[in-house]
Amino acid sequence: MAVKGSIVRISGPLVVAEGMSGAQMYEMVYVGEDRLIGEITRIRGDRAFIQVYESTSGLKPGEPVVGTGAPLSVELGPGLLGTIYDGVQRPLPIIAEKVAEVDPRRRMFVERGIQAPPLPRDRKFHFKPEPLKEGDKVEGGDALGRVPETSLIEHVVMVPPGIRGRLKWLASEGDYSVEDTIAVVERDGRDVEIRMHQRWPVRIPRPFKEKLEPQLPLITGVRIIDTFFPMAKGGTGAVPGGFGTGKTVTLHSLAQWSEARVVIYIGCGERGNEMTEVLERFPQYKDPWTGKPLMDRTVLIANTSNMPVAAREASIYVGITIAEYYRDMGYDVLLVADSTSRWAEALREIAGRLEEMPAEEGYPSYLASRLAEFYERAGRVKALGSPERSGSVTVVGAVSPPGGDFSEPVTSHTTRFIRVFWALDTKLAYSRHYPAINWLMSYSAYVDLVTQWWHENVDKRWREYRDEAMDILLRESELQEIVRLVGTEGLDEKDKMVLETARLIKDGFLKQNAFDPIDAFATPQKQFRLLKMIMDIHRKSLELIEKGVTTQQILQALGRLYIDIVKAKFTIPNDQLEKIDEIRDRALKALDELVSG
């Protein structure tokens, strides 16, 4: 029986209700006459402390609070992809239509207490059953059938985790809605109806058979990421950076061009116009791997800065639960959260309302454990059930440290749980070097794990060239200290060449225009050819210096070719890589003529 209490205190997004004996932690409740969605976060005696995921303006003591008897959950099934939700999985386009029916002038507002089913009830999906027969044993994760959800993704309809028994009936091929029963399983003498959709509590990670080592790179098309600081499928990463360093554009690039089959984009507490930009741009883009519309693989969760702060936490958990669901089907999923700092600020505000003892910079003492809960749900796994399949959830979170201070609590705690750190540098951004990822501060723990893939699929010398280029960039930063003191005249010719090659790496390889149709995405093969061209020229130059040629003579010999080398990244498409080799050969020939001529 549902618990029913009444409001005794209201403090912003926090509501205290009495008469709630029998309520459970994290139970979903309806608050007030408008039935606002809330979640119980603390119980003391018969009083429940509820964080409300909608505006509490106009609530008053004495209004009812009704429990649902279930935790905050999401609906999982066909129809998720291509949809935009708010922080508690309400479909915003449908809400806009509902509001417009009452008053067209209020179409742009989310009315308080408005409800809409997350999955479309009126849409039919074509269900094709698996070759199962009556009496077969089935368990959680087993595939019952498949539905072509979009042009890119085939949705696997699975037995919900925790259900095990004998298959009594399976629907034949045909068109069904998400509420239709598509199978009946006999479990302990009782019949369990399985619909095309299932519900899952957002705070509980979905189970899996086995966790696998993340050995496959997640190709993003961003050269500095894929070559120098690679992300693995099932990995965790953070993009910290101050104001204006390009966090959002970097995350948009990842969402647009990544090799992931499904992308979950969470706009958590950031500006509304950034989500609007995603909505305007994504439908126009094609998936680089298939040529199909990008929205066919994307779920957007919009919880912008002008929406209730409590829902920021819900949006993070809703997003990761949807990601785990597609992982269980055997897909590689990328979850992008922009930004986890806004979620942490929401935790700080609610902790203050709860009168909890503040820790560092006012954040609650459990900030680290909440961040860990989120990032630990990433990973590459062997999914439950049959047929056997593996999937992954890759999590990348933006961090917005005030003033670009990486020692603040959210950034410092995040670094404990992630293995890739793409540090955005204000100086690089202000000098118009984008992406502004600082190669001295950034790191990736996946370089050794993904090396084998690069060697087998691209070139066996990838690691050799990559490490050599990294050494040049590190050496250049040391030499810059000397140059500031005594100028370039105090350097020997080899060190001068290191400075020139480092400049070539930065201009011709690291800089990348996210809005250029050719330069926005570089295949692994193009990345390697560009790097190889620059490094082969560097090696040849060092040989010539040994023979007495000066750095100035080398640069003069290259002449206009220097510009061709820098421009190759945005003048040569991914399918014409032989032109990069032609530029390289012409450059090496010009250098050879310095000695032979």
Curated annotation (Swiss-Prot):
GO molecular function: ATP binding; ATP hydrolysis activity; proton-transporting ATP synthase activity, rotational mechanism; proton-transporting ATPase activity, rotational mechanism
GO BP, sorted A to Z: proton motive force-driven plasma membrane ATP synthesis
Cell compartments where the protein resides: Cell membrane
EC number of this enzyme: 7.1.2.2
Residues the record lists as binding ATP: 241-248
Pfam families: ATP-synt_ab, ATP-synt_ab_N, ATP-synt_ab_Xtn, ATP-synt_VA_C
Enzyme class: translocase
One GO cellular component term noted in the UniProt record for this chain: plasma membrane
Keywords attached to this entry: ATP synthesis, ATP-binding, Cell membrane, Hydrogen ion transport, Ion transport, Membrane, Nucleotide-binding, Translocase, Transport
Reaction catalyzed: ATP + H2O + 4 H(+)(in) = ADP + phosphate + 5 H(+)(out)
Top-level taxon: Archaea
Membrane-related topology note: Peripheral membrane protein
SMART domains in alphabetical order: AAA (SM00382)
Annotated PANTHER family: H(+)-TRANSPORTING TWO-SECTOR ATPASE, V-TYPE PROTON ATPASE CATALYTIC SUBUNIT A
Annotated family: Belongs to the ATPase alpha/beta chains family.
HAMAP family, sorted: ATP_synth_A_arch (MF_00309)
Name listed for the protein in its UniProt record: A-type ATP synthase subunit A
